[in-house]
Curated annotation (Swiss-Prot):
Main localization category: secreted
Protein family according to the UniProt entry: Belongs to the protease inhibitor I20 (potato type II proteinase inhibitor) family.
Protein known as: Proteinase inhibitor PTI
Entry's localization field: Secreted
Listed SUPFAM superfamilies: Plant proteinase inhibitors
Disulphide connectivity of cysteines: C3-C40, C6-C24, C7-C36, C13-C49
Gene Ontology cellular-component terms listed: extracellular region
Gene Ontology MF: a single term: serine-type endopeptidase inhibitor activity
PANTHER family xref list: PROTEINASE INHIBITOR TYPE-2, SERINE-TYPE ENDOPEPTIDASE INHIBITOR
Database matches in Pfam families: Prot_inhib_II
Site (Reactive bond for trypsin): R38, N39
InterPro entries, A to Z: Prot_inh_I20, Protease_inhibitor_I20
Domain of life: Eukaryota
Length: 51
């Protein structure tokens, strides 16, 4: 299980729950990261990134 949230997740990465349900795409640019709360979205189990 990873610890992240949609705000802090990287653009181009999709985040999924443990049962494979799509939750969100990340909103943070790795070169210019968002200021995000550091909480873990407990629904997010894994990510798949396109690059």
């Amino acid at each position: 299980r990873i610890c992240t949230n949609c705000c802090a997740g990287y653009k181009g990465c999709n985040y999924y729950s443990a049962n494979g349900a799509f939750i969100c795409e990340g909103e943070s640019d790795p070169k210019n990261p968002n200021v995000c709360p550091r909480n873990c979205d407990t629904n997010i189990a894994y990510s798949k990134c396109l690059r």
